[in-house]
Amino acid sequence: MNKASPVHADMHQFEVKDTQLQIGGYSLDQLASMLDKQVFYAYDQTVVKAQIDIFHRHIPASIKLHYAIKANPYMPLINAMRPWVEGFDVASQKEMLMAIQSGMPNRDISFAGPAKQLPEIRAAIVAGITLHIESELEFERAVKLGQELDIKPIIAFRVNPAFELKASGMKMGGGPKQFGIDEERLFEILPTLDYSQFEFRGFHIFWGSQNLKQEAIIDAHNNTFALAQKLIDITPTPTVTVNLGGGMGIPYFPGEKRLDLAPIGENLKQLLKQYPQLAKLELIFELGRFLVAEAGIYASRITDIKVSRGHTYLMTNGGLHHHLSNSGNFGQVIRKNYPVAIGNKMGLAPEEAKVSAVGPLCTPLDTLADKMQLPKAELGDWLVIFQSGAYGPTASPQDFLGHPHVSEILV
C-alpha cells in the first residue's frame, strides 16, 4: 500500500465567497482595482490580531509580547500592531525610526543585530532605546559614544547560549555564532564591568526561529530560564528585563502542522514558579513571522499558459524578485512548495495532472510552484501564495532584471 504524500496545513484563516478568496473582506479583483496593480501582497489585519490572541490565550499574562519588525516592516502594519503588542524589536536605524514614528514608547523598543555601525549606535543612544550588545567592542563603542553625548546608553547583552534549539528552521544560538556574546565569556566579564557608565537593562537570549516542535521549544525555554538565572546571579547590579527570544514557527511546507502553544504555556507557568526571581522581572517574547506570516498572501496574474514536453507551466507577472523566500532561495536547502491556490477558484477540484507556476525572470530559480495539483487554470486567473506575510518584499531582490516593484496593502 502506497504511503500518502504529505499535504499542506489548511489555509482556513481567510474567508471564501463563491470561490473567491477574500482578504479583509475584499476579493482579489477588488484589491487589484483599489491598487491599480495586477500583482501585489495583501495583509489581513484580523488574522494578525487572531495570532496575537492565540499567543495571549496560552502564554502567561506576565510575559510581554514584542513584534520583530524585520519580519514585515510595512508601515501601515506597524501602525496597526502598535496597540496590540507591548514593544518593537528593530534591526537597523531605519526600523528604529519606523518604531518611534508609530508612537511606541522608546523604552519599549530594542535594537539587536551584529556589526552595528557607529551612526546606528549613536542614534539608538540619543533616542533612548535599548541596545542589545552583540560584541565586547560594540559595548566599548556604546560606552564611549555615551560619554561623548553625555547620555548613558541603555544596554542589554545578547547572549550566545551554549545550548542549541533542536529542529530549528534557523539556528541563532549554540556553537560559534556571529550573534551575541558567548555565555561563558559573559560569565567572565559581567562581574568586572563599571555599571556606572551605562544603564543596564538585562539580557537577550535568542536561540533560533521557525520551530514547529513544542518539545524542542519547551527544552529551549528550560535552558533559557536556567541560563538567565545564572547570569543574574553573577551580575553585580539588578537585572530589569530578559528577552526570552522567539522561536515559534508557522507551517509552510507539506507535512507541517500549526504549533500548539498550550503545552508551551503550561511549561512556562511552571518555570515562573521554579524561578521566582525571574518571574518578578520584565520577561519578553520577541516574535515576527508567527504574528504576521499567516496574514499575508502574494497574488499574481496568470498571463500565459504553455506546455513543454507534456508539462504545463503557468506563466505569471510575479516571481522571486518579489518573493524570494517562496522560490526556495532564502534559507531552504531543498526547495519545497508554499501553499498555493487559484484565488478565484477556491474549493474547486484540482486536476490530476501537476503543473508548475513561474515568473518572468531569466532563471530557472524563478519558480512560484513546482509540480502541484491545482484547479484548471485559465488566462487572467489569480495565482496565490499563502503564508506570505513575513520576509516578502523587503527580503527580495526587487531590482533584479529591472521589473516593477510589488505593491502592498493592509486591509
Regions from the PLM with identified roles:
Residues 278-411:
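Charged (often Lys/Glu-rich) extended helix/loop segments that serve as interaction or gating elements
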Residues 2-9, 161-304, 400-403:
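Active-site loop/helix belt of alpha/beta enzymes
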Residues 48, 70, 92, 124, ...:
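Conserved, mostly hydrophobic/aromatic
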Residues 1-147, 151-152, 195, 199, ...:
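A charged N-terminal "starter" segment
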Residues 64-66, 87, 106-110, 130-132, ...:
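Structural preference for beta-strand elements that scaffold enzyme active sites
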Residues 73-76, 97, 164-165, 209-213, ...:
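Flexible loop/turn segments at secondary-structure boundaries
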Residues 47, 71-73, 94, 115-117, ...:
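Active-site-proximal loop/turn and secondary-structure-junction residues that shape catalytic pockets
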Residues 26, 43-46, 50, 72, ...:
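Conserved active-site and cofactor/substrate-binding residues in soluble primary-metabolism enzymes
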